[in-house]
């Protein structure tokens, strides 16, 4: 097995971390909105920004995996 394939597989694992992080953040945001419904818009804004940043790391990992495999 080529080391490039292993490296690409490891790069794709960033999606796993992003998925776990977004799941935890969404759960906590839901709890926070349930406790303080009047702050829902601020919590939702922070959640969307954080989820976007977390998802960006997964996309970067996928791009790097494609770059490694097509080299």
Curated annotation (Swiss-Prot):
A GO MF term: lipid binding
Protein's UniProt keywords contain Cell membrane: yes
Membrane topology: Multi-pass membrane protein
Listed Gene3D superfamilies: F1F0 ATP synthase subunit C (1.20.20.10)
Segments traversing the membrane: 4-24, 48-68
SUPFAM superfamilies given in the database record: F1F0 ATP synthase subunit C
Pfam family, one: ATP-synt_C
Site (Reversibly protonated during proton transport): 55
GO cellular component term of the entry, any: proton-transporting two-sector ATPase complex, proton-transporting domain
Keywords: ATP synthesis, Cell membrane, CF(0), Hydrogen ion transport, Ion transport, Lipid-binding, Membrane, Transmembrane, Transmembrane helix, Transport
Cell location: Cell membrane
Principal cellular location given in the protein's record: membrane
Function: F(1)F(0) ATP synthase produces ATP from ADP in the presence of a proton or sodium gradient. F-type ATPases consist of two structural domains, F(1) containing the extramembraneous catalytic core and F(0) containing the membrane proton channel, linked together by a central stalk and a peripheral stalk. During catalysis, ATP synthesis in the catalytic domain of F(1) is coupled via a rotary mechanism of the central stalk subunits to proton translocation. Key component of the F(0) channel; it plays a direct role in translocation across the membrane. A homomeric c-ring of between 10-14 subunits forms the central stalk rotor element with the F(1) delta and epsilon subunits.
Subunit composition and interactions: F-type ATPases have 2 components, F(1) - the catalytic core - and F(0) - the membrane proton channel. F(1) has five subunits: alpha(3), beta(3), gamma(1), delta(1), epsilon(1). F(0) has three main subunits: a(1), b(2) and c(10-14). The alpha and beta chains form an alternating ring which encloses part of the gamma chain. F(1) is attached to F(0) by a central stalk formed by the gamma and epsilon chains, while a peripheral stalk is formed by the delta and b chains.
Record-stated family: Belongs to the ATPase C chain family.
Name of this protein: ATP synthase subunit c
Organism: Clostridium botulinum (strain Eklund 17B / Type B)
Lineage: Bacteria, Bacillati, Bacillota, Clostridia, Eubacteriales
């Amino acid at each position: 097995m080529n080391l490039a394939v292993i490296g690409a597989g490891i790069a794709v694992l960033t999606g796993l971390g992003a998925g776990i992080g977004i799941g935890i953040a969404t759960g906590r945001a839901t709890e926070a909105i349930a406790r303080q419904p009047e702050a829902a818009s601020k919590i939702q804004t922070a959640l969307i920004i954080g989820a976007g940043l977390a998802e960006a790391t997964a996309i970067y990992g996928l791009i790097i995996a494609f770059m490694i495999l097509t080299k």
